Amino acid sequence: LHLLSRRQRQMCIRDSLNPRLVFLPIMTILGTLAGCAIAGAFMSQRSPLDCMAVGAGFGYYSLSSIFITEYKGPELGTIALLSNIMREIIALLCAPLLVKYFGKLAPISVGGATTMDTTLPIITRYSGKEFVIISIFHGFVVDFSVPFLVTFLCSISF
């Protein structure tokens, strides 16, 4: 952004603040939880709630895996750690394919909580500089939701 004129920067920021993009982190959260619940329905070893708790890490492996280990045990905590690391690796390695086949917002959604830090350079490279602000906003909102969703989903018992 520093190479752009002041007017170009203002236009870039204004265009990035599309009100519809505010819903991207919400849709990422809902889509991830729905996908995990559906996957959990087909697993005999794990409940849909366990799968949703793992998915609610959204790539924030250093925090979610610790919470899940404390609430549900080391086995599910390890699954959460590996699942979140894989989410980040997929976002990093598949960003060009995600943009090509699903659009410029796809790597942001796939990146989950990592979109404001580790996956931001890759997202910027393949989605474009105009997606930096929405990527940071997305990462912040999703990142902020992790401790609340993980602890909530781990504390529910049927």
What spans do the regions from the language model cover?
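Juxtamembrane boundary at the C-terminal end of a transmembrane helix
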Residues: P147-F158
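Entry/N-cap segments of selected transmembrane alpha helices
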Residues: R14-A37, L81-I89, I134-V142
